[in-house]
Amino acid sequence: MESIKVLVGWENKNYSAVAEYNGVVVATHKDFETLKKEFEDAFAFHITESAKDGDPIPATILEGNYSFEYELQISALLHIFDGILTRAALSKVTGINERQLGHYTQGIRTPRPQQREKIVQGIHQLGRQFLAVV
């Protein structure tokens, strides 16, 4: 089974999903779960039409033998957790200023790879703390 990498971001009150496969496939939506469904439909349409145009598409892809690997940009990741995790809690475990986290959430700024890793590790740390509750 082939894994298709999909980059997900958040900007202008919408999630966006982009994958480069025999061109570019794009979908947008306000809701993350709906975005995934819309993207899957757009990808299937793209593959079908590309094959009709004579583009070389592997048989495994034409048969639907693929999965999507969604890689969330920090703007999308933070937006998903906005309202669930406070910026104060995330700031406490990451050491990143709440205001800066807000800029990342809104897509105003893009974190350096080290900052992204701090945020992901902070979310994991909070998750472990929640799991430790008996």
Which residues does each predicted region cover?
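Short, charged, surface-exposed hinge/linker loops at domain edges
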Residues: 1-3, 41-99, 103-109, 114, ...
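Hydrophobic micro-packing sites on short alpha-helices
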Residues: 116-120
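DNA-binding alpha-helical recognition surfaces that contact promoter or target DNA
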Residues: 37, 103, 121
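Residue cluster at the C-terminal edge of the helix-turn-helix DNA-binding motif
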Residues: 122-129
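DNA-contacting interfaces and partner/effector-binding or oligomerization modules
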Residues: 1-55, 59
